[in-house]
């Protein structure tokens, strides 16, 4: 990790220095593990008491928490956002070699921009267009006529099928598959007849996709991922799904076909969302949500039964299973009381 003076770091982060600005910062760590040469952050005043035992050389915090800090500090309005920017400055992610590995297989009909990097055993088929500064990791497959915008990076073993469009400055983690066939079949007297998926996948700019996520191509129209969308690991995005700009999708989410999700939504982990319906802008669905109907109003939508001790859960489950009968009995009692 690169070293940097605290004062220089503060200048890049637009932060106020309190304490020794000449302190050399060698890394970022959590509150409980930070050493005197490292910097940490306090994003929630509820954990203010941790400052008393923190050994970090400096802490990123708000003005309100400064009196409780025994070390040097960088004072900012939003410590967590500052931490994100600080991590970018001190990032240790290996940078790719600016070359094309000898083992890469590249079609003569592919078009490569300037400073493109292609790892060993990657396959680039005919008609592919790679913008400037694109990075294709080792073992990737890029299918025919796919376009990848400038500055985008695919880690090792990403598979992108034919005629997919990926925008600029996207980041796609290993094992992800984009543009595989959607789950389309017609039934002929008990036999499943495959429907070729004739659409594609269009991904906007600044999209990040986690490891081992699958985004299927559309049946006729395209599956669309908007600008600024972030998708976690092991998600399944079915054919013809549309995800609006700047929506966040946590790990393990399953979206059924032809679902339309609005902008600025947040989908909690392991949620399952029905297809052929719409979720409006600015909806937050909590983890393990089961969404069976359209959502037309912005807001927070929890689902499911939170964890309980087994004995309590069994009683809760029994009540839920018998809710219809309980409701009928209650209405009968109400009618009896009304008559009296």
Swiss-Prot record:
Pfam families: Hexapep (PF00132), LpxD (PF04613). Its EC number is 2.3.1.191. It catalyses: a UDP-3-O-[(3R)-3-hydroxyacyl]-alpha-D-glucosamine + a (3R)-hydroxyacyl-[ACP] = a UDP-2-N,3-O-bis[(3R)-3-hydroxyacyl]-alpha-D-glucosamine + holo-[ACP] + H(+); UDP-3-O-[(3R)-3-hydroxytetradecanoyl]-alpha-D-glucosamine + (3R)-hydroxytetradecanoyl-[ACP] = UDP-2-N,3-O-bis[(3R)-3-hydroxytetradecanoyl]-alpha-D-glucosamine + holo-[ACP] + H(+). One of its GO terms (biological process) is lipid A biosynthetic process. Pathway: Glycolipid biosynthesis; lipid IV(A) biosynthesis; lipid IV(A) from (3R)-3-hydroxytetradecanoyl-[acyl-carrier-protein] and UDP-N-acetyl-alpha-D-glucosamine: step 3/6. Keywords: Acyltransferase, Lipid A biosynthesis, Lipid biosynthesis, Lipid metabolism, Repeat, Transferase. The keyword Membrane does not apply. The active site is at 239 (proton acceptor). It is an enzyme of class 2 (transferase). GO terms for cellular component: membrane. GO terms for molecular function: N-acyltransferase activity; UDP-3-O-(R-3-hydroxymyristoyl)-glucosamine N-acyltransferase activity. Belongs to the transferase hexapeptide repeat family. LpxD subfamily. Homotrimer. NCBIfam families: lipid_A_lpxD, PRK00892.1. Catalyzes the N-acylation of UDP-3-O-(hydroxytetradecanoyl)glucosamine using 3-hydroxytetradecanoyl-ACP as the acyl donor. Is involved in the biosynthesis of lipid A, a phosphorylated glycolipid that anchors the lipopolysaccharide to the outer membrane of the cell. This is UDP-3-O-(3-hydroxymyristoyl)glucosamine N-acyltransferase. The gene is lpxD.
